[in-house]
Amino acid sequence: MSATLSLLASVVMVAAEKDYTKYVDPFIGADGGGYVFCGACVPFGMVKLGPDCNNLTENAGWQAGTDIMGFSHTHLNGSGGGCKYGNVLFMASTGDLDPNDYASPYSSEKAEVGMFSVNLDRWNVSARLSASAHAGFHEYTFPESDNSNIFVDLGKFLASIEMQEFVGSEVTILSDHEIQGYTRVRNGWNYSKAYTVYFYADFDRAADSFGTWKEGRKEPGRRCQSDNNTKSGAWFSYRTNAGDKIRVKVGISYMGYNKARENAMELKTWNIEDTRAQAVGAWNDILSQVDVESGDEDRKKIFYSSMYRIFLQPSDYNGENPVWKTDSPYYGDYHAIWDTFRATHPFINLIRPTTGGEMVQSLVDIYENDKYMPDARSSHSTGRTQGGSNCDMLVADAFVKGIRNVDYEKALDAMIKDATVPPGDDERQYGRGGLPDYNRLGYVSTDYERGCSRTFEYSANDYAIAVLAKGLGRTDVYNEYVRKASNWKNLWNPGISSFGFSGFAWPRNSDGTWLDDPEFTVFSSGSFDHQFYETFSWELSFYVPHDVNALIDKMGGREKFIDRLDTYFRESFPGKRDELLFYTKLVGLCQISNEPCFLVPSMYAYVNQPFKTAEIVRRILDTQYTSARDGVPGNDDSGSMGAWYAFHCLGFYPNAGQDVYLISSPVFPKTVIRMEDGKELTIVAKNTSDKN
């Protein structure tokens, strides 16, 4: 059994005494660019059942102020960019069903742990949703009507920029209370191969009439629409009295119909409150591992909501791998490790190390069966790689934290392949792009996209390889990669100045000359086709997490380093606003709405000034995070923003891949962290306040 499903007796006892889920608001971050998933799910659940407001929303499905299109069973949390998922969409209506026009305005929406509810105003129908790991529970309350409908639209999916593409679907009405089918989709943000989501739906009431449709053309009484690359759906209709409830259990699977039916059986009763209670119990098992004492109820709400989001992804796909047979743990929806290696996975490793180890082992298994460990992976396809081979950071972090349920010898093989074997034409999907330059020149030149940011990330990745190699007694590998971990110095240009400081990360041509472009500045930023991926030189120049002492020397010594940090958090951004991708949440030059800055506030610890870290962190916590629906400063990115907040509330922050936590100031007067092995860490912050 996977650790995700295991229970700790000591934690269960605590959970029974206190309901931590009452402090969780799944709507925090759903608006304002946080793209937080607000529907129903269990920790790491494969099913994430929630509303899709239109097919052009982001990955979480929710978009305030638009109509609800329906409720689909697959989502990601907090991810920007092109959409994935939004598969197997169910909806309810009244009157004559039009498969091309059924979206509804909504009201009275409410998101709670294990439950999402909303009124569909167009149809005078209320919906309640809950979920287990592999199944969704729907409950619809109807008005008096001769035609109350529940239907599934297999042609729907989320389809914003970098669009997913429809491939095919099939639907069959098995009886007057059962429907099964599948939808097949490809592409999206990770340019995935086609993936198939099967479903089996069981209704608690026999339909009075039924039918199917193909490409929007209804065929009443027809039981099946076969797959010929067309969009299909099916409906059940009922005569209802006011207040009648109809319930549906929907199991999904990536393996086939039998597994989908088996997964539906996770829902043992027809009482949605039972499903909700099981979800609440699963969440309390996790949330109770961090017990905070505080009279600040709003802060507790933000904290536990942040912690909740850490455990939404990656998704536990054990037993649901359609690509290869494996006895290894199998997790997916790493979206993306470039975001999550910094805080999300270290937090999981802190309180659920067995699960953290399973995740790392799943990455090793992916390497053995699909070329490389992924930087991102969803719908059982790898891609895309945003920067470095940052699985290396996850492996090193698990190793130095003493997590042992990982085959580290194979993990080291995977890391070395990252560092030595170019991915060829698949540079945005696999491995390290620009690797021939990096290994020949010691940096990725301007001949390749993202050359500067890749070089700095590869240097940190190489240090992670060295850490593991040393731990495994591979001295030769350690010596090679600890040397390569200094390659960032090859892109340190002492001739670049800003705000009175000299020496910054800077792109370099393959002939050794520096990039000379008057339009390119220390504030220039971009995406995949830029030299700085979602960062800029002022920020990237701090990214030497593995050798801060050498960085301090490059910046001119201790006092200059302190001055530069002070300036980074004090000065206003002087560049053109459109140069910065994620400028909406700036603290000085620090774009806390994006991950490359995550470690910087804690770097004062390396010059013995943690009090400045405490001041900066508290300012960010107080001004950039709230309990409102737009209360997350940027894309939550699989819990990354939540993990940054949660760690700093505890008063320490990880330097991922190292056995180091950097100290700041705890927010709560007392915190008890209950470890998986039964040990407890108690943090007491005497006289803590907004000013202390």
Segments (PLM) and residue ranges:
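Bacterial N-terminal signal peptides
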Residues: 2-10
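Accessory carbohydrate-recognition regions in carbohydrate-active enzymes
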Residues: 15-345, 349-393, 399-456, 464, ...
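ATP-dependent phospho-/nucleotidyl transfer catalytic cores
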Residues: 461
